[in-house]
A protein has these predicted regions:
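A phosphate-binding catalytic loop at a beta-strand-loop-alpha-helix junction
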Residues: 64-83
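Cysteine-based protein phosphatase catalytic domain of the PTP/DSP
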Residues: 1-66, 87-121, 125
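Structured catalytic cores of enzymes that bind and process phosphorylated ligands/cofactors
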Residues: 113, 132-133
């Protein structure tokens, strides 16, 4: 956690179920959302993704914020959440996936997780008020 603090990270979105980073981050003043997620290749609920997106977008509203999204290996869960965050920021899904893969080449976008993000984005769009309303 010291390394993250030295890199200027202010917020951690922790997707690993194995361990809560909160106690390690507190002495460094880093805010943590522990959003424990099994890497079980089962569909993930939109509520799980929304919780992470809410935390990320609130963090990114702060001009000096640096957000770090992670899981245990950085292969499935963190990329899924990063994809949800970027889509919530109006990125096209395919472009977001390309960016994530460019930054983290070991990413494996499991179909079930990508579909979970698609469902989340779709439900988000349905719940947002339309400009004509």
């Amino acid at each position: 956690m010291e390394e993250l603090a030295q890199a200027g990270v202010t917020h951690v979105l922790d997707m690993q179920i194995e361990f809560d980073d909160g106690p390690l981050a507190a002495p460094h003043g880093i805010r943590v959302l522990w959003n424990p997620t099994d890497d079980d290749f089962l569909p993930k609920p939109s509520e799980l993704l929304q919780r992470g997106v809410d935390f990320a977008l609130e963090a990114l509203d702060e001009p000096s914020a640096r957000l770090y999204i992670h899981c245990a290996a950085g292969v499935h869960r963190a990329p899924m959440m990063t994809l949800a965050v970027l889509c919530a920021m109006d990125w096209e899904m395919e472009a977001a996936m390309v960016l994530i893969e460019r930054c983290r080449p070991v990413v494996d976008f499991a179909d079930v997780y990508v579909e979970s993000v698609r469902r989340y984005v779709s439900s988000r769009m349905e719940s947002e008020p339309r400009a004509s309303e």
